A protein has these predicted regions:
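Feature captures hydrophobic
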Residues: 1-135
Length: 135
């Protein structure tokens, strides 16, 4: 069971996205990449940055990033690890999380609101990865 966040978790998430017919259909017109910034809590001592490049229903690449300056993604979503845990365990809807600022978004919220089904299917891909959390 990979720890969240880790390069092993990101690799399994990438594979889950690319193996999901539901995500492929929901995101067939999506073009955009993300940083998912995991703010430290519990056993975590520093932030972790997960990068994923999503293009027409597939992940073109996903990795851990050491520094925010490595890439310039269209979207950055930040939250403490406990909030990410709620999202991955489907206890917090990601759109609701952004609207209530539990998940902090940098990027075009309108574009994300037009792709609600894709966002929900992306979370479903997260649930396919058995995860161990530091909180």
């Amino acid at each position: 069971m990979p720890k969240f966040p880790s390069k092993e978790w990101v690799a399994e998430f990438h594979d889950a996205v690319n193996g999901s017919g539901a995500y492929a259909k929901a995101a067939e017109n999506w073009e955009g990449d993300f940083y998912f910034v995991v703010e430290p809590e519990g056993e975590m001592s520093e932030e972790a940055i997960l990068y994923i490049d999503l293009w027409h229903g597939k992940s073109r690449g996903a990795s851990m990033v050491a520094d925010r300056s490595e890439k310039s993604p269209e979207f950055v979503i930040s939250a403490p690890v406990s909030v990410w845990k709620k999202v991955i365990e489907v206890k917090l809807d990601p759109i609701q999380g952004m609207m209530t600022r539990q998940l902090k978004l940098k990027g075009n919220m309108v574009k994300i609101m037009k792709a609600v089904k894709a966002a929900k299917e992306l979370v479903n891909c997260c649930t396919m990865v058995e995860s161990e959390f530091p909180v």
